[in-house]
């Protein structure tokens, strides 16, 4: 059986570092503050928001909410983001997806201040990531990097295949890996020789959003498999990788749940603390 790359010890290490920084801010009278912005009603988005609230409350980070009706206008949404940008007591802003169809079509997240963009989704932060400048990294891709670092898995000079090309995970993760001198191949729904490419990889990352998409015929002996998928099947959380089918074949594999997801919320907290630093530097 391959080595299980548990997310818990990585999360615990990061959480310890986060708490230490929060205590330092407390001595200065600063309480890190995140504003969660939500449009309409969505059960998954609400569950995600509550999980963040529980974790942040436990470690000493304040969370406030800004809720909008489904039919909120682009102008009203833009105005609210501008007010949050000017509010020095709000250090970071998290916009829950999905937005309304109109706001998604208008790409409303572009009105988010890059300095408070703790998810690294604005064009400015993504552009800086592309050229290798200091910026907020998208949380899930950075969580993968934190896991690789913790387990001392180097990607330098290795063939890495990322299955998935989303703007929030697949593309930014590919850049982060490329910046570490990996040879990266991005695969997607139109890739013709997908199985051949995934079997060739030394490190395989599944971020396609389809339950159990990666099976035993798509992996090879000794491979490192990182599963980013979060799919609900019959009430259970499962990954993009068929864990039971491939675990005895590969060398290393992350579980779902218990893998990348638990690290992602810690990265969000780390980004928020960086936003606090930016805010203090401006003031």
Curated annotation (Swiss-Prot):
Transmembrane segments: none annotated. Its EC number is 1.5.1.5, 3.5.4.9. NADP(+) binds at residues 164-166, 189, 230. GO terms for cellular component: cytosol. It comes from the Bacteria. Keywords: Amino-acid biosynthesis, Histidine biosynthesis, Hydrolase, Methionine biosynthesis, Multifunctional enzyme, NADP, One-carbon metabolism, Oxidoreductase, Purine biosynthesis. GO terms for biological process: L-histidine biosynthetic process; methionine biosynthetic process; purine nucleotide biosynthetic process; tetrahydrofolate interconversion. InterPro entries: Aminoacid_DH-like_N_sf (IPR046346), NAD(P)-bd_dom_sf (IPR036291), THF_DH/CycHdrlase (IPR000672), THF_DH/CycHdrlase_cat_dom (IPR020630), THF_DH/CycHdrlase_NAD-bd_dom (IPR020631). It catalyses: (6R)-5,10-methylene-5,6,7,8-tetrahydrofolate + NADP(+) = (6R)-5,10-methenyltetrahydrofolate + NADPH; (6R)-5,10-methenyltetrahydrofolate + H2O = (6R)-10-formyltetrahydrofolate + H(+). Homodimer. Catalyzes the oxidation of 5,10-methylenetetrahydrofolate to 5,10-methenyltetrahydrofolate and then the hydrolysis of 5,10-methenyltetrahydrofolate to 10-formyltetrahydrofolate. Belongs to the tetrahydrofolate dehydrogenase/cyclohydrolase family. This is Bifunctional protein FolD. The gene is folD.
């Amino acid at each position: 059986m391959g080595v299980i790359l548990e997310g818990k010890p990585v999360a615990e290490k990061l959480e310890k570092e986060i708490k230490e920084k929060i205590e330092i801010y407390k001595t200065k009278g600063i309480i890190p503050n995140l504003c969660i912005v939500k449009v309409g009603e969505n059960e998954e988005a609400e569950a995600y928001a509550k999980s963040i609230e529980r974790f942040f409350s436990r470690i000493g980070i304040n969370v406030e909410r800004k809720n909008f009706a489904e039919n909120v206008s682009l102008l009203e949404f833009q105005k609210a983001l501008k007010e949050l940008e000017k509010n020095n007591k709000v250090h970071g802003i998290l916009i829950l997806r999905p937005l309304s169809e109109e706001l998604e079509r208008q790409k409303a997240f572009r009105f988010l201040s890059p300095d408070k963009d703790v998810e690294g989704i604005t064009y400015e932060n993504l552009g800086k990531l592309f050229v290798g400048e200091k910026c907020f990294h998208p949380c899930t891709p950075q969580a993968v990097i934190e896991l690789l670092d913790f387990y001392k898995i180097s990607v330098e000079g290795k063939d890495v295949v990322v299955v998935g090309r989303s703007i929030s995970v697949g593309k930014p993760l590919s850049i982060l890996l490329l910046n570490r001198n990996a040879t990266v191949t991005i695969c997607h729904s139109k890739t013709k020789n997908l199985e051949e490419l995934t079997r060739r990889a030394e490190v395989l990352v599944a971020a396609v959003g389809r339950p159990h998409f990666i099976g035993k015929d798509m992996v090879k002996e000794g491979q490192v498999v990182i599963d980013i998928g979060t799919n609900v099947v019959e009430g259970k959380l499962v990954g993009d990788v068929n864990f039971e089918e491939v675990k005895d074949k590969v060398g290393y594999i992350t579980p779902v749940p218990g893998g990348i997801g638990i690290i992602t919320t810690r990265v969000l907290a780390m980004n928020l603390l960086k936003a606090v630093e930016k805010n203090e530097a401006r003031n």
